[in-house]
Every structure is written in structure tokens, then in C-alpha cells.
């Protein structure tokens, strides 16, 4: 079969009754369905209206620069991607900084110290690499936010991100891995945990516990779902999806989910596989080699259902993934149809 013994659960969105389940408590790879947890903890712990700022200035002391960061997840590592999406890019900030250093030091790039706060280690590494290629090798020194504030002089270049709710919407809609990782770490820190994968694991577990769900089968190695060592169960994902849907605070998560045949990572799904379900499915997609997952909501005639499908034992390769996606689409097509079948099978009925 296309789905090769998947883990599945179908929950009545009105009553919370489990309508169908298969391997619902079996540990499976979530792939990017993991981002549902990242989105939920971001809404819970971060101010959705706030923005991130990054400001770069000449230092008050000679031969110093100051970068006042705020762990902005939105700054793109790629300039071309940034231009397409109207985002600031690390190369843009780095280039403008380099020009200002030359101007203030009569063309010299030697003996410069950069004091910085709240930058991701990956961003620091990328800045160093960008500058090193251009002959600029400053001493980079991590300091507190207060210290950068005290040492900042003439402003050079900066950026302000959109509100966090817009960043989260993009993250879920397009399954952006880097943003998911960074938002989850920010959420972990806001919840009082460490700014690390371990902190993320703790904040995900706390979310489950809050809804009375046993987190013992959750294995969190990252927040994006890229790690093949992540593990969830279909029930563990389905129950929070049911609970979150009832809480107006989490409406943003629901609205950010791609719509089948219409938007985001589901824009090309259902169009040929289950045309009757186009516009009726809102869900988070997931794909790894040998794994295809989907979790979210499907509208039927008189109610909405919560569903989770974790097929993590399919054959490797693009063809198998495409077949698995089509099989999941057809299943949801049958649920979206006027009468929900008494038994959900993996094999589509032939007309």
C-alpha cells in the first residue's frame, strides 16, 4: 500500500470523539508537522505584535563597531531571497558596515573590534565569512545588550522585522525551517528555558502537559522537523490540534495553515487527486526521504474533523512520496465528501 502501515487519527472537531485511529500511539517521524508545536508555543510565549530590530553603529571608542541585535529570525542569509520577500539580508547589513568602516578609518580595515549582542551564532559565522572574503577580519566580542547600548555611536545601518504574527504566518504557510527553529528557541527562552534544542524540547513537552497529554513518547531534536530522530504519535499531535482549535488565542495558527489546492505548501495538492476536497483542508505538510505526513483540519458536510497521518515507513524516493501524498489526499477527499465512510481504508475506491 502507498502509505505502508501509517499512524493515523481522526477526531470529531465538535465533540472531541476519536472517530478512527490506527497506530495512534506508535512513535513516528513527524517531519515538518513538528512545526505545529513550534507555532503553538510561539503564540503562547511571544508577543505577536512585537518586532525585532537590528542596529549597527560606529562605536563611541575609536576602531569599534557595535551591533545591537534582538535575535531577529527574519534577517535572511541570502540576498536574492531577501530581495524577493522584502526582507533585510545579512550580506546587505555586512556590506554597508564594511563601507562605513572604510570611510571612518581612512580606508583601513585593520584593528577593528565589534561588540555585539543577541545575534545567532550562525549569523555571526556568516558575517565573519562575508567580511573575511573582503579582507576584513575584526575581533568579534559578544557582550550584553546594555553594553552595546552604552557603546553605540553614529548609526550605520539597521533593520526592523515585521510583527511576529506575520513571521509566524509565513513560517507555517511555507514550512520555513530556519524561522521555525529560531521562533521555537525564542519561545523556549521566553518560557524560562534555555535558548537551545533542549529548551525547545522542554517548551514542547510543557504544551502537551498543559492539555493533559502524556509527553513521554515525544522526542524533540529540532523544531523544524528536519531531524529524522524526532518522534511524535498521531494522538499526541491530534489532541492539541483539537484543543487549540477551540481557543481563540490560537486562531492565528489555524489561519496560517496552508489550504488544500489553494495556498502555501498545499497549493498543488488535491487539484487532481481529490478535487472535491479543494479548499476544505487546512493542514501542515511534512516530507523527509521515506516519510510523508499531514496534520490539520478537514471540513465535512456538517462538521470539521481533526486528522493526523504519519507515513514514515514508505519507500525512499520522490515517486513513493508522490504516491503517499496522493493516497492521503484521496482519504481526505472521502472525509470531505457528504458522507464519512464507516471505515477508512488506504485503498481508494475505484469508480
Name each model feature, range by range.
Residues 1-27, 49, 90, 96-106, ...:
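Beta-lactamase-like hydrolase cores
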Residues 7-11, 19-21, 37, 55-57, ...:
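Soluble periplasmic/extracytoplasmic beta-strand elements of cell-envelope proteins
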Residues 13-15, 23-26, 59-61, 70-72, ...:
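Solvent-exposed coil/turn segments that connect beta secondary-structure elements
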Residues 16, 30-48, 171, 307:
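Active-site SXXK
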Residues 19-21, 190-351:
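Small-residue-rich helix-loop
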Residues 45-62, 139-143, 250-255:
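Short, well-structured active-site flanking segments
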Residues 61-96, 154-184:
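Conserved catalytic neighborhood of penicillin-recognizing serine enzymes
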Residues 99-252, 256:
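A small/polar active-site loop signature that marks catalytic segments
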Amino acid at each position: 500500500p502507498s502509505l505502508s502501515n501509517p499512524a493515523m487519527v481522526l477526531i470529531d472537531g465538535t465533540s472531541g470523539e476519536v472517530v478512527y485511529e490506527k497506530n495512534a500511539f506508535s512513535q513516528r517521524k513527524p517531519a515538518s508537522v513538528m512545526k505545529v508545536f513550534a507555532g503553538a508555543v510561539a503564540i503562547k510565549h511571544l508577543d505577536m505584535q512585537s518586532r525585532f530590530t537590528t542596529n549597527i553603529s560606529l562605536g563611541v571608542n575609536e576602531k569599534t563597531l557595535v551591533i545591537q541585535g534582538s535575535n531577529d529570525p527574519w534577517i535572511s542569509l541570502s540576498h536574492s531571497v531577501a530581495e524577493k520577500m522584502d526582507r533585510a539580508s545579512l550580506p546587505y547589513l555586512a556590506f554597508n558596515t564594511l563601507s562605513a568602516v572604510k570611510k571612518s578609518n581612512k580606508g583601513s580595515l585593520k584593528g577593528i573590534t565589534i561588540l555585539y549582542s543577541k545575534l545567532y551564532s550562525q549569523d555571526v559565522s556568516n558575517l565573519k565569512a562575508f567580511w573575511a572574503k573582503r579582507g576584513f577580519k575584526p575581533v568579534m566580542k559578544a557582550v550584553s545588550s546594555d553594553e552595546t547600548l552604552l557603546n553605540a555611536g553614529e548609526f550605520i545601518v539597521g533593520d526592523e522585522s515585521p510583527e511576529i504574527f506575520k513571521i509566524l504566518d509565513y513560517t507555517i504557510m511555507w514550512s520555513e525551517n530556519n524561522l521555525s527553529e529560531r521562533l521555537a528557541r525564542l519561545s523556549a527562552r521566553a518560557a524560562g528555558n534555555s535558548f537551545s534544542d533542549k529548551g525547545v524540547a522542554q517548551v514542547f513537552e510543557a504544551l502537551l502537559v498543559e492539555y493533559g497529554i502524556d509527553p513521554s513518547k515525544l522526542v524533540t531534536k529540532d523544531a523544524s522537523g528536519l531531524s529524522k530522530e524526532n518522534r511524535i504519535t498521531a494522538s499526541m499531535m491530534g489532541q492539541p490540534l483539537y484543543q487549540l482549535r477551540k481557543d481563540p488565542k490560537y486562531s492565528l495558527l489555524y489561519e496560517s495553515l496552508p489550504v488544500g489546492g489553494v495556498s502555501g505548501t498545499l497549493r498543488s495538492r488535491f487539484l487532481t487527486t481529490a478535487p472535491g476536497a479543494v479548499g476544505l483542508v487546512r493542514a501542515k505538510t511534512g516530507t523527509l526521504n521515506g516519510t510523508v505526513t499531514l496534520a490539520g483540519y478537514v471540513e465535512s458536510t456538517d462538521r470539521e474533523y481533526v486528522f493526523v497521518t504519519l507515513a514514515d515507513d514508505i519507500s525512499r524516493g520522490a515517486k513513493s512520496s508522490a504516491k503517499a501524498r496522493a493516497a492521503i489526499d484521496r482519504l481526505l477527499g472521502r472525509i470531505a465528501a457528504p458522507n464519512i465512510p464507516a471505515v477508512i481504508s488506504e485503498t481508494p475506491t475505484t469508480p
